[in-house]
Swiss-Prot record:
Phylogenetic classification of the source organism: Eukaryota, Metazoa, Chordata, Craniata, Vertebrata
Protein name: La-related protein 6
Membrane found in the keyword field: no
InterPro entries found in the cross-reference section: La_dom_prot, La_HTH, LARP6_RRM, Lupus_La, Nucleotide-bd_a/b_plait_sf, RBD_domain_sf, SUZ-C, WH-like_DNA-bd_sf
Tissue expr: Expressed in numerous tissues. Highest expression in heart and brain, intermediate in kidney, skeletal muscle and testis, lowest expression in testis (at protein level).
Motif range (Nuclear localization signal): 296-302
Domain characteristics, as noted in the entry: The RRM domain mediates the association with collagen mRNAs stem-loops.
Length: 492
């Protein structure tokens, strides 16, 4: 603006006046903009959250915002710039090459599942140099991946890719047994169980038993694919190098006579293995396992005994649970068929069978014969001394408050009130307990049941003992209950 004023108006004074006017106008505009900005921020404008360098519209203020941006950008650029790299010396190169070559060796890859996983993940077998630099033993030597990549240029067994960021072996990585990947070799064992091979194993005139066995295996497995080799392994003899490393995993190798059938394709070995699995369902046949897969596991004797004990414990727990359920069912059945139900059918054959089974299972089942008419088909007079002594201390189902319903049967309510002093109502047969309860109810003077002798001899107007609704019923022409030693026998 000032340069344009100087060109149009050559006079120096005029130029000064124009500059002053422009400056005043700019100041006024700045003040108006500041007032508008203040009012906007007061009204909740989002511009109030902006920094001063980016929120101003004046000609002087933008320099602050741009300067801050330039400064931050320069700092980021400096952070992105990596420090100056220098090539390592020969000693460091040698140590790095030796360490990483050991990482990629067969001996280490067979044990190092992590590195082997990264080798298998890449189709070409490359592994990141940065990943190798992060390994503990390499990190002690250098932390710069460029130093590691420079050292790997001098390796004989390793090679880098085009951008020198990944490395791989020059030779392919073999298939290790612990990878559980199918291979081309099939291990056939238990050869003596095959009927055909057993016939071939008999002494031959020409003595070529091993050749006969190999011919039989070629004929058997040749239908699945092309076979490259068949080897018979004798126990106690030295194993080939490629079989020696799997002998620790497959216990059949070296301990019994077995055969190694190697196919030219993996699919053929897989098909042959599937065929042998179906054929070896019966124990009287030879078996096969695909080398590279997990060997068949045999349960040790301890586990078998443990399984037998666990099975026996399970059967015992089931029998105990069944016993508890039977006892609960017996209690429900006896209460359902008790004397509180006037419509109960004592001659029901189903109830008789249920109670007979309960009496056989439970040693205390004979105690319920005084409470339930369905518990025994026989009858017995109350005058029996044994029945009196045992019947006094028995608990009547009328004492179960949860099963009584006085509103439905007033007769039951009346009888319970009349016979409340009997020992069958109270859980305990002790006379002192009965006296205390009768004193609380205010019926001690009216009730003659305080005496244990009277409670045994008291009878109602119907001729029944106190607390008994009716006598047990049984078939006609019977003499009552048998003695204690004959009670377990069924009545005919």
């Amino acid at each position: 603006m000032a340069q344009l004023g100087e060109q149009t108006l050559p006079g120096p004074e005029t130029t000064v006046q124009i500059r002053v006017a422009i400056q005043e106008a700019e100041d006024l505009e700045d003040l108006e903009e500041e007032d508008e900005g203040t009012s906007a921020r007061a009204a909740g404008d989002p511009a109030r959250y902006l920094s001063p360098g980016w929120g101003s519209a004046s000609e002087e203020e933008p320099s602050r915002g741009h300067s801050s941006a330039t400064t931050s950008g320069g700092e980021n650029d400096r952070e992105d710039l990596e420090p100056e790299w220098r090539p390592p010396d020969e000693e460091l190169i040698r140590k790095l090459v030796d360490q990483i070559e050991f990482y990629f060796s067969d001996e280490n890859l067979e044990k190092d599942a992590f590195l082997l996983k990264h080798v298998r993940r890449n189709k070409l077998g490359y592994v990141s140099v940065k990943l190798l630099t992060s390994f503990k033993k390499v990190k002690h030597l250098t932390r710069d991946w460029r130093t590691t990549a420079h050292a790997l240029k001098y390796s004989v067994t390793l090679e880098l890719n085009e951008d020198h960021r990944k490395v791989r072996r020059t030779t392919p990585v073999p298939l290790f047994p612990n990878e559980n990947l199918p291979s081309k070799m099939l291990l056939v064992y238990d050869l003596h169980l095959s009927p055909k091979l057993w016939a071939l194993a008999t002494p031959q005139k020409n003595g070529r038993v091993q050749e006969k066995v190999m011919e039989h295996l070629l004929k058997l497995f040749g239908t699945f694919g092309v076979i490259s080799s068949v080897r018979i392994l004798k126990p106690g003899r030295e194993l080939p190098p490629d079989i020696r490393r799997i002998s620790s995993r497959y216990s059949q190798v070296g301990t019994q006579e077995c055969a190694i059938v190697e196919f030219e394709e993996v699919d053929a070995a897989i098909k042959a293995h599937e065929f042998m699995v179906t054929e070896s369902q019966s124990k009287e046949n030879m078996k096969a396992v695909l080398i590279g897969m997990k060997p068949p596991k045999k349960k040790p004797l301890k586990d078998k005994n443990h399984d037998d004990e666990a099975t026996a414990g399970t059967h015992l727990s089931r029998s105990l649970n069944k016993r508890v359920e039977e006892l609960q069912y017996m209690g429900d059945e006896s209460s359902a068929n008790s004397s509180s139900d006037p419509e109960s059918n004592p001659t029901s054959p189903m109830a008789g069978r249920r109670h007979a089974a309960s009496n056989k299972l439970s040693p205390s089942g004979h105690q319920n014969i005084f409470l339930s008419p369905n518990a025994s088909p026989c009858s017995s007079p109350w005058s029996s001394p044994l029945a009196q002594r045992k019947g006094v201390s028995r608990k009547s189902p009328l004492a179960e408050e949860g099963r009584l319903n006085f509103s439905t049967s007033p007769e039951i309510f009346r009888k319970c009130m009349d016979y409340s002093s009997d020992s069958s109502i109270t859980p305990s047969g002790s006379p002192w307990v009965r006296r205390r309860r009768q004193a609380e109810m205010g019926t001690q003077e009216k009730s003659p049941g305080a005496s244990p002798l009277l409670s045994r001899r008291m009878q109602t107007a119907d001729g029944l003992p106190v607390g008994v609704l009716r006598l047990p019923r049984g078939p006609d022409n019977t003499r009552g209950f048998h003695g204690g030693h004959e009670r377990g026998r069924a009545c005919v």
